Amino acid sequence: MSKRGRGGTAGGKFRISLGLPVGAVMNCADNTGAKNLYVIAVHGIRGRLNRLPAAGVGDMFVATVKKGKPELRKKVMPAVVIRQRKPFRRRDGVFIYFEDNAGVIVNNKGEMKGSAITGPVAKECADLWPRIASNASSIA
């Protein structure tokens, strides 16, 4: 029995290593007032029994704010991963990783809630999310 869905995608997103499972806490790299983001669920993950869904660079996930402004805390909101510590392979064969895990809060359309991003944004994320790329100070 062959595995289904293992072929390459036309355009789309290149498969990268997933470094942030459900329950992970990462830095919030925008100026919304949130200090960190807690991963609740990952968009588009079908899953398998007993396997934790995980997010990688460029993935949208459902998050809550654990530290930050009181008006942001105790609410469920979408966010996007912009950096991860786990090394992932680019198309040109080079492995890249960042010094922290970070995400930004967005709305359902992918538009940022904040207006600035601290630190670099992965190229993979910038290609998928143009509104995040326009607010990025540097793209790595």
Curated annotation (Swiss-Prot):
SMART domains: Ribosomal_L14 (SM01374)
Gene3D superfamilies assigned to the protein according to its UniProt record, in alphabetical order: Ribosomal protein L14 (2.40.150.20)
Keyword Hydrolase: no
GO function terms (MF aspect): large ribosomal subunit rRNA binding; myosin binding; structural constituent of ribosome
PROSITE patterns assigned to the protein according to its UniProt record, in alphabetical order: RIBOSOMAL_L14 (PS00049)
Keyword terms of this UniProt record: Ribonucleoprotein, Ribosomal protein
GO biological process, one term: cytoplasmic translation
Annotated GO CC locations: cytosolic large ribosomal subunit; cytosolic ribosome
Similarity section: Belongs to the universal ribosomal protein uL14 family.
Name of the molecule in the record: Large ribosomal subunit protein uL14
Protein encoded by which gene: RpL23
